[in-house]
Amino acid sequence: MAIARGDFVRIKRPESYWYNEIGKVASIDKTGIKYNCTVRFDKCNYAGISGTAEGATTNMFAESELEKA
């Protein structure tokens, strides 16, 4: 089955901060870019954005790096 917007997925990219974590697909880009799936998570990563203490809660992944949860 193909991954669709709104699906909950497990991250399978070993070097990712969110490896083996579950997130929700926010969007899928169909233009042919490599990392076409935007995935949203409940927790923040370690990198602050624009001088704030909070980190990112989204990241881009290829469909091959995701599996349905």
Curated annotation (Swiss-Prot):
Gene Ontology CC entries for this record: photosystem I reaction center; plasma membrane-derived thylakoid membrane
Pfam families to which the protein is assigned, alphabetical: PSI_PsaE
GO annotation terms (biological process): photosynthesis
Topology of this chain in the membrane: Peripheral membrane protein
Keywords: Membrane, Photosynthesis, Photosystem I, Thylakoid
Localization in the cell: Cellular thylakoid membrane
Major location (coarse): membrane
Family as reported in the entry's similarity comment: Belongs to the PsaE family.
HAMAP family xref list: PSI_PsaE
Designated name of the protein: Photosystem I reaction center subunit IV
Gene assigned in the entry: psaE
